[in-house]
């Protein structure tokens, strides 16, 4: 965030995907009671680890971390908790978290990530994601899935005003 001509740019997305994401993030922050900063914000979405050649329509799950980073850069929430895990979620215009597609795949990919420097030795990595997806992600051992319902709840967790319990994994049924 820089203090010159106001602009909110999402670099690396198609025009439509960037416009939709910007609108969801702006609206969710407004619903939270925060004014959108009158500054220059550039978010670069780099696709080097994505197998698809066109990620422009598949990154709505970055709405939550982008919104939280904007709040942290404004000093509205502390930065430290944001680095304690991975935050994923598509925001609705009202600030609610929408279900993710591929939560289990995302959780599995996080297990192989190098967490040194983020987690203390021996701690299990944290994955913050929509509450409806947390039991699915909790199927992966080696990660703690924590379910969120909204941007407001994510802010409360980041500010340590509320605690979350790890999700219980979905029950496996034998047929």
List each model region and its residues.
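Peripheral, non-AAA+ core regions of ATP-driven protein-machinery
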Residues: 1-175
